[in-house]
Amino acid sequence: MFMGEYSHTLDVKGRLIIPAKFRNQLGEKFIVTRWMEHALRAMPMPVWEKLEQQLNQLPLGKKEARQFKRFVMAGAMEAEIDKQGRIIIPSNLKTYAGLAKNVIVTGSGDSFEIWSDENWQSYTAETAENFDDIAEGLVDFDF
């Protein structure tokens, strides 16, 4: 399971160190794609394959379904970790996520997310402010 919050830096070549605890769970190759709130989502191949199946079952007669599928699939890339524990983030994904030097890597259960420090700080501040309301809105979640 991917969990925790880690602060790292993106080097000038667009390489990002993946936390050691995450590397052990990823396998040889994994997928990184655009995700919600201008973050990137990275996941092991089995998780990607499940998501891919779900995307392929979306009703393509609905514009939103086509948009979501295209956006996620077109933004997806296969990644490998180098000997120094880094991955290369291509420029299109860096631009989408607003990644500069300071990057936050966050665990998200079956996957992890890559955020710009600025976007993450803004997101967590807003979420913290509304956390009780968010929790109460999860009607199917048994605390």
Swiss-Prot record:
Domain SpoVT-AbrB intervals: 5-47, 76-119
Q: Which InterPro entries match?
A: MraZ, MraZ_C, MraZ_dom, MraZ_N, MraZ_sf, SpoVT-AbrB_dom, SpoVT-AbrB_sf
Which Gene3D superfamilies does this UniProt record tie to the protein?
Transcriptional regulator MraZ domain
Q: Where in the cell is it found?
A: Cytoplasm, Nucleoid
Concerning Pfam families, the annotation shows:
MraZ (PF02381)
* GO CC list: cytoplasm; nucleoid
Matching PROSITE patterns: SPOVT_ABRB
GO annotation, biological process: negative regulation of DNA-templated transcription initiation
**Which NCBIfam families does this chain map to?**
division/cell wall cluster transcriptional repressor MraZ
**Assembly and partners?**
Forms oligomers.
What name has this protein been given in UniProt? Answer: Transcriptional regulator MraZ
Q: Which organism is it from?
A: Leuconostoc citreum (strain KM20)
Per the UniProt record, the lineage of the source organism begins with: Bacteria, Bacillati, Bacillota, Bacilli, Lactobacillales
